[in-house]
Amino acid sequence: MRLHRLRDRSGVRVQDRLVWQAASLLLAYPDDGLTGRLDTVAELLGHVAGPAGELLGHTAAALRAREPMAAAMDYVATFDLRRRATMYLTYWTAGDTRNRGREMLAFATAYREAGVPPPIGEAPDYLPVVLEFAATVDPGAGRRLLSAHRVPLDVLRGALADAGSPYAPTVAAVCATLPVATDQEARRADRLAKIGPPAEAVGLQAFTLTVPPRRQEGAPSV
């Protein structure tokens, strides 16, 4: 049986886990460890079949072709300076409201229940962290977290695609591992992309996993 058809005991396809792991590495901040992460991604892609491998490969190739400083500046401009491109998943479901703390706690609780501590260097809802958890710790719980935040992922995918970002194919590969979005989810994603998340400014103490941390805030600049 081919690797992409195999499933682990949680029922998650091995190929999906490979996609999540590669995506986690590609979506991390391009620091001094980027070359090593790209080498790991190349090894993973040797086992990823079909369109997913091509999508991830596009991002990997684009990152290899860029100078480190240019890659870092593009990353900040893409994910920190564009509200629609935030990778903090609860930002789209709760915005800067009191509910966001509770929603981030749900991620931290999922990590603890799987036997690992919450993140140390990033917020628990940060997409590369969630992908790493889904790929390497608890695929079933990880898929549930990703599926529950399909709308934010679709908003992110659309924003990156509209901007012509090299990261867009990677988020598209992640979305392809999840159940197809319903009509209601598609409408909600479109609405959020136009008007933004709920608003209620309050102070939040962000949780602080192993992807390279970039900052302490849990929300992007607007």
Language-model regions, residue ranges each:
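Charged, alpha-helix-forming regions
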Residues: 1-127, 131-222
